Amino acid sequence: MTVEQVTGTAPHTTTTAGREPFLARTKRALAGAPDAPLVLLGNVEVEDAWAVGEVGLPAVGGASATAALVHRMDELALLLAGPHDHVVLKAEPDPDHLAHLDALGVGLPTVHVAGSSDPLRTVTLDALDSPALLARLGELAADGVRLLAHGTSSAEEDLATATGLRSVLPDAATTKTVNSKVYSRGLCDELGVEQARGWACRTVEDFERACAEAARLVADGATVGVKDAYGVSGKGILVVDDPRRLDQLVRMVARRAARSGDDRLAVVVEVWADKATDLNYHFTVGRDGSVAFDFVKEAITEGGVHKGHRIPSRLPADQVEALAELSGRLGARLASDGFHGLVGVDALVRTDGRLLPVLEINARSNMSTYTVPLQERFQPDGWVALARQYPLVLDAPLPFAALHDLLGDLLPGAPGEAGLVVQGTGTVNAGASGPTSGATFAGRLHGLLVAPDDDTLTRLDRAVTERLASRPTGRPTEGDAR
């Protein structure tokens, strides 16, 4: 796209992103210069921090079985950063993987590893517990390096305070506000943006009314999703196709409120739309309020859990233009509420071909964010790509050298060749961080498949899946490879 669009008077100008590299555009918008040095922090699922103090769905407590795996997604930031940037990680990246990327011509950042690491903590909390790392980050701050986190919570504010690093993102309170699903529905109502039929619930009374209406629709055959305001990746969501389940949920919520004396609630209730294709589109809100539409990708999801993207989307040009125009309106509204940064919006194409342009707004880095520099380097014009995650069942750590031997000719030898670009090995071996006593554990391999056409892409994906499955192993004893 080359059309420049203006959605209102300056500074709320929306442009479609041109050929300047994504990282340079991001730095220009958020740090004021395309070559501004940054410290990147992959604190994925920051929603868990935002959800603290919120009253959501009744749930069983305890740590997620996949928390250790999710926290090792910090390594995704490695390939978003440039050679003059810095990345903080929970553990040392695999040196053979770094050598492989270097041989492919990827300019890698300087890596700083936390001295204290707990599998169940985010990379931010590990960094805060690492005095030597804090001192080094303080030196970078004195040199003018700034902080770009996946998203800002109070922990990232604490890190900025402890090191002197200035964040290129807004404060935690603002970021939390604009990432609520309740906020998202209200924003769309205000702008007149079509969304799934639903209700934003701030009190138990709101929830009772919403569920009464939803139960009638479910009785007529509809399916309803009940979502926590800060649920993510399939957590904090109930899919309901029986009105009795809604009645049960209302009773549970009402009893809890009666016991606590607190009738606050932060959930949304939505009627599931008939879906042909999931979408994720992405825009950047600059510090000056300008909005740049970055891209739209087809999203691959299973049960509400992100699994990958197909790139580029196969939307017709008029629908891409419609999403670009809407990005300007959404971005301007976010800017008026004090937000600047990266934004991904989940949407879908209905079975009749019409767009449902907003399911939820994620005003933070998205999974779609992290593959853009790889696309720019490894996906030639006219080629197709698949950002993919492969579940693994392992009985011992799988180093990159072994992965390289296993996948062999399925890995590209240079940009412009078809193959799988491996994003990291942190999630592959995250389950091995605790004692296994010979038991198996779940891992996950993230990568970007590139090919000249869809048929080749499909064959390549199948070949990678088969090679990975050819490793002899049992089934995981706990957790899953979500």
Could you say what each language-model-derived stretch is?
Residues 1-30:
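Intrinsically disordered, low-structural-confidence terminal and linker regions
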Residues 66-82:
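Histidine-anchored nucleotide/phosphate-binding helix
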Residues 72-76, 88-209:
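Conserved N-proximal alpha/beta basic substrate-recognition cap immediately N-terminal to
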Residues 194-196, 219-225, 242-274:
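Conserved ATP-binding module of the ATP-grasp superfamily
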Residues 221-238:
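Conserved anion/nucleotide-ligand pocket segment
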Residues 379-482:
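Peripheral (often C-terminal) accessory segments that flank ATP-dependent C-N-forming ligase machineries
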